[in-house]
């Protein structure tokens, strides 16, 4: 809900004169608007209303916020229950329901008017402090030098971690409370030292390209394996070379092993036809239709058919694949009759787009989807428009079904037989004419 709608509901509950143009950017009206908006957004997930009661949700939230404002800050504030667009009895019932649901969702059941504890304003960045105990260059030499140099540096230098100044703690009661919507948060712009330290550490462990530095990886390996200090320098250099090669590949060893195992089993995990419960967008469907050069009207019909059946699909790509191929076979039926290789080209192209090498899966999708849409009006109109019925023209179907006067199995002897045959032919031909 927009802020203007919230302000309109608050004005109706307080019966403010719209001609006076009250100031919503400051004062108690701003606090009431913010409190109403918070209550409204919270109640959307906590309180379910009927369709005729939904129009009063914002008014009820505005009434509850005004009541709280009246109890805590402004005893002379006037608010009216008859401004809620519901019956008074039903409005009171819904207000009790809102209070119960919203109070149960709050972790604090008893409100105590005690001062909130102040945040620590001491930050090592603002006060000129440092996060590390020594210079990074010295740390790098001590950590990644040879074992002999590491031992000497450990014996000669003693690391002293400077203690941070003590935190200023203010005595506060044991009972704390949440800040209400009417209270302004004065410390929103302050930065906490814990978050600053975490962000700086995360940036220091990552390079510009988004991958971790080799030095930090070697440092972790050095700490995890205490026996690595006694290994010769050549072994460490070979290990660092292998780690650099692995980083150059860009994939961890676990993914490489998984991909190798899948290649041995012959599985293709990236096939779109076996992807379950994925939500396809209209842009993806239109892009697939454009790949097969389908007309605009046909693409729109495919999108409509997908939206109708989208809620009960497990593998939605199978439906879209079957719809596109069935329509492609009809639209390009003339070229298919002239060149049989086009069918193979269409199926191969769909296999590459679906990221599968199994032609049987694509053909199975075509058969299943055709059973679904064979009786749809838009599909029948498409067949009539392009004169294609399972790869056969309409006149050929009539010849096979009713025969002609020249066939020996359908010789017409009397005028009545001729009239019946003529009536059937005219009826079948009339089905192809647009309504």
Swiss-Prot record:
GO terms for cellular component: DNA replication preinitiation complex; nuclear origin of replication recognition complex; nuclear pre-replicative complex; nucleoplasm; nucleus. The modification Phosphothreonine is found at residue 146. Its main location: nucleus. CDD domains: ORC6_CTD (cd16075), Orc6_mid (cd11583). The lineage of its organism: Eukaryota, Fungi, Dikarya, Ascomycota, Saccharomycotina. The keyword DNA-binding applies. It comes from the Eukaryota. The gene is ORC6. Belongs to the ORC6 family. It comes from Saccharomyces cerevisiae (strain ATCC 204508 / S288c) (Baker's yeast). Residues 106-256 are annotated as: Disordered. This is Origin recognition complex subunit 6. Disulfide bonds: none annotated. Keywords: DNA replication, DNA-binding, Nucleus, Phosphoprotein. GO terms for molecular function: DNA replication origin binding. Present with 2970 molecules/cell in log phase SD medium. Component of the origin recognition complex (ORC) that binds origins of replication. It has a role in both chromosomal replication and mating type transcriptional silencing. Binds to the ARS consensus sequence (ACS) of origins of replication. InterPro entries: ORC6_cyclin_first, ORC6_fun. Residues 201-213 have a biased composition (Polar residues).
């Amino acid at each position: 809900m927009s802020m203007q709608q919230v302000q309109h509901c608050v004005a109706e509950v307080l019966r403010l004169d719209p001609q006076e143009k009250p100031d919503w950017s400051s004062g108690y009206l701003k606090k009431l608007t913010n409190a109403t908006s918070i209550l409204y957004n919270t109640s959307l997930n906590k309180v379910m209303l009927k369709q005729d009661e939904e129009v009063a949700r914002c008014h009820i939230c505005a009434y509850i916020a005004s009541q709280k404002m009246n109890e805590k800050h402004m005893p002379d504030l006037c608010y009216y229950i008859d401004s809620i667009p519901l019956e008074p009895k039903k409005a009171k019932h819904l207000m009790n329901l809102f209070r119960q649901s919203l109070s149960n969702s709050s972790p604090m059941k008893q409100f105590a008017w005690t001062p909130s504890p102040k945040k620590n304003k001491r930050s090592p960045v603002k006060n000129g402090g440092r996060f590390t105990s020594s210079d990074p260059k010295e740390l790098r030499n001590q950590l990644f030098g040879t074992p002999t140099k590491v031992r000497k540096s450990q014996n000669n230098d003693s690391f002293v971690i400077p203690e941070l100044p003590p935190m200023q703690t203010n005595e506060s009661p044991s009972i704390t409370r949440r800040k209400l919507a009417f209270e302004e948060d004065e410390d929103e712009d302050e930065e906490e030292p814990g978050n600053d330290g975490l962000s700086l550490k995360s940036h220091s462990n990552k390079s510009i390209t988004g991958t971790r530095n080799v030095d930090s990886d070697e440092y972790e390996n050095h700490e995890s394996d205490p026996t690595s200090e006694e290994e010769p320098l050549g072994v460490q250099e070979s290990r660092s070379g292998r780690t650099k090669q692995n980083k150059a590949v860009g994939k961890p060893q676990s993914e490489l092993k998984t991909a190798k195992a899948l290649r041995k089993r012959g599985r293709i995990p990236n096939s779109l036809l076996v992807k379950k419960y994925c939500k396809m967008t209209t842009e993806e469907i239109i892009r697939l239709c454009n790949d097969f050069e389908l007309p605009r009207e046909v693409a729109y019909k495919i999108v409509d058919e997908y939206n109708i059946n989208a809620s009960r699909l497990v593998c939605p790509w199978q439906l879209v694949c079957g719809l596109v191929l069935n329509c492609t076979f009809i639209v390009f039926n003339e070229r298919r009759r002239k060149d049989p290789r086009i069918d193979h080209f269409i199926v191969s192209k769909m296999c590459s787009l679906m990221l599968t090498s199994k032609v049987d899966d694509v053909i199975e999708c075509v058969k299943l989807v055709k059973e679904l849409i064979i009786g749809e009006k838009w599909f029948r109109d498409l067949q009539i428009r392009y004169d294609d019925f399972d790869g056969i023209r309409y006149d050929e179907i009539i010849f096979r079904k009713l025969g002609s006067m020249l066939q020996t199995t359908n010789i017409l002897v009397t005028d009545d037989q001729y009239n019946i045959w003529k009536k059937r032919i005219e009826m079948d031909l009339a089905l192809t004419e647009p309504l």
